[in-house]
């Protein structure tokens, strides 16, 4: 596959069709993820009330479930939205923020994965390792250690849950247990801003809304997301100016930039 050309094609499809991405996401990143959704060309909605979950999810093209700021009412909404998404064939993208940091988070993730059919799990190495049963350590929401390298961990959880797993880091790893893809795009300044991992989950959801092969959607999304960061970095003097430049780069990202700058390789 020509990953760069296909990524450009998917981005064009998003911009033309403007799919609705429903987020049940955390309070820290809500505004940022809404903006990233818009800059990619999709439409965001952040609805959390249990009373409207079925209706709102039914009109969406993808659902993000992000556990960053959990409460029992939000968990109820997650299950209701997730079951509606499964019934309607709408892809679910799960961001297990801080899984492993507390038993509440870890148990909630396991319940979600047991009761819902998730299309893509997007997390850091520690979170994914813990969910795969390989051990690891998460401090707050940051990965400290894991029970293996990213490729092995992604494959393990993908096989366990029968879904696609994306581990973001210096090099992004995407695997469905059979196919494994590496994305080398990105910039270290993404780590200076809170919520950039959560926003990458939003990118995966936007791409999943129009590309129904999860590995392809996730790899192309993370390629475009990382490439925008690379384009933005030379224009920035620090984290604040980088954020503005990054948003502009996402909004203005075009096929020529993607075809020249995307770095994706399939390793199995």
Curated annotation (Swiss-Prot):
Keywords linked to the UniProt accession: ATP-binding, Kinase, Magnesium, Metal-binding, Nucleotide-binding, Thiamine biosynthesis, Transferase
EC top class named in words: transferase
Residues annotated as binding substrate: 46, 195
Pfam families according to UniProt: HK (PF02110)
GO molecular function: ATP binding; hydroxyethylthiazole kinase activity; magnesium ion binding
CC cofactor: Mg(2+)
EC numbers: 2.7.1.50
GO biological process: thiamine biosynthetic process; thiamine diphosphate biosynthetic process
Pathway: Cofactor biosynthesis; thiamine diphosphate biosynthesis; 4-methyl-5-(2-phosphoethyl)-thiazole from 5-(2-hydroxyethyl)-4-methylthiazole: step 1/1
The protein's role, per its UniProt record: Catalyzes the phosphorylation of the hydroxyl group of 4-methyl-5-beta-hydroxyethylthiazole (THZ).
Protein name: Hydroxyethylthiazole kinase
Organism: Desulfatibacillum aliphaticivorans
Lineage of producing organism: Bacteria, Pseudomonadati, Thermodesulfobacteriota, Desulfobacteria, Desulfobacterales
Gene name in the database record: thiM
